[in-house]
Amino acid sequence: MRGLLLPLMAAVLFAQPPARVQTGYDSIQASRLKADLTFLSSDALEGRRSLERGSEVAIQWIASEFAKAGLKPAAGDSYLQPVPLIEFTADRNLTTLTVTHDGKSETLRGADASAAFANEVSGSGAVVFAGFGITAPELNYDDYAGIDAKGKIVLIFNHEPQEADSNSSFNGKGNTRYANNNYKLFNAQRHGAIALVTMADPGHQGPLRGAPAAGAATPGRGGRGAAQAGARPRIPTEALADGGPSIPLFTIGARAADGLFEIAGKKAADVRSAIDMKPAPASFEIPGTRIEFKTATSDRRRADSYNVAGLIEGSDPALKAETVIFSAHFDHDGIGPNGIFHGADDNGSGTVGVVTLAHAFAANPVKPKRSILFIVFAAEERGLLGAYYYVSHPLRPLATTRVEINFDMIGRNETADPRVITEISPDTSNQLGLIGTHYSPDYRETVERQNKTVGLDLTYKWDLDAYNQVLFRSDQYPFLMHDIPGVWWFTGFHPDYHQVTDTVEKINFEKMTKILKLAYLSGFEFADAAGGPKLQPRAKAM
């Protein structure tokens, strides 16, 4: 009797999807996911490293699947949007900052001052300290208020104010979109700075995230590419040849930072505390001081990768001009000294997810009212480059892009990883993390409503995690910076993350199937709802 009751109880607990979306929903099958992911993470694709042969195979495979599904090419008459890249190695010895005060100069390099900038540039100017480098009108906070950064070098803290304060006007123990150094670099550029210099936030004990360093494999990435020492191949840095920042970002060590504050008669920790008290900016010019900077590179080459994009046009004459996006990234880490970095979970799983949903929506007789763009980004492991390029060169207008569902690592169960500090539930076999829903309660409510059919265990813990700074570490972040509700769907870290052991036999295909069914239902609701989910600028995780 017990065995008969369990299926009946499950049927009561989880409703069936509406008949109008049933065909596409039923087409999402674990067997297809396994076949596709087995290919995408196979030795033949050589780890899909950006600008190498394996990534080109992945690009062509994704495009061919979009064509088989009958998607409309989204990049003119092609599925491929070129992403112009510069690959280079930063010269740690010739990349320098020279600080001059009272006629005395000191040149900093290496561990004291580093940068990874694609162009070889030099310049000099006065120095201003601009707090955390944040301009947030909705929070009534502007570190640039009262200072003139034009033609100057701007020094800032990493992170954001009140990170340990649950009552913060920012996001307390989580992050807002302003804590990322790539945002701060563009903000400094908008204020006329000629270079940005970041230093460790003296009030934050976590790792210095999101700061490109000379020779770093993932500039601006926020550390998501970190791996165990010696295990990961040494990979040249990549940057956008078009659409990236035009000024360099330097990171300086504690000794150099303390010296600059000493010139101003201040201590960094005291200034940090003063900002936190209100919070209010405490910016100032560092008197009688100039910095001369120089960046240098080697092994520089220009090449294109590609975002792969296909479209299902909406069925509603008015709403089809609006867009719902499903995204992932296809690139990984290539071949290292220990073998091939297969990237089954990261991010073969997300790539297969987007392709699977393209087939599901195409197979469903009833089409969504809004148009749906399926896009798989290039060079995410190199700094979200494909996504950043897209938002500066959109294939569909950003103003009418309503929402993004971004898949990155949706195939595993979260397990303890010594590189990641987080609390883990005793059972993660049915768990899905949603990162960034604190910016859109409407988004969260939609997914939770559709989850009544699927029955996953949803967690929002990463929105309260300033330490690992996951908000900035996948392709939804550039959309969030353009006020588009973008959420990263993520099943969590594990010891195989960025290791050669991230292989297909470890994927939980049953859970991955449920995640894609939930995304399908959520995507349909986003596409058919009277209005899109609203972005809440004053984000606060609960």
What are these regions, as identified by a protein language model?
Residues T38-S41, Q81-P82, V127-A130, I153-F157, ...:
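Structural recognition of the beta-strand scaffold that forms the well-ordered cores
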Residues V21, T100-G146, A239-G343, H359, ...:
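Soluble metallo-hydrolase cores and metallopeptidase-like ectodomains found primarily
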Residues H359, A363, F490-M542:
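His/Asp/Glu-rich mid-to-C-terminal helical/loop segments that flank catalytic regions of hydrolases
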Residues K104-G110, N119-E120, A145, G151, ...:
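Metal-dependent peptidase/peptidase-like ectodomains
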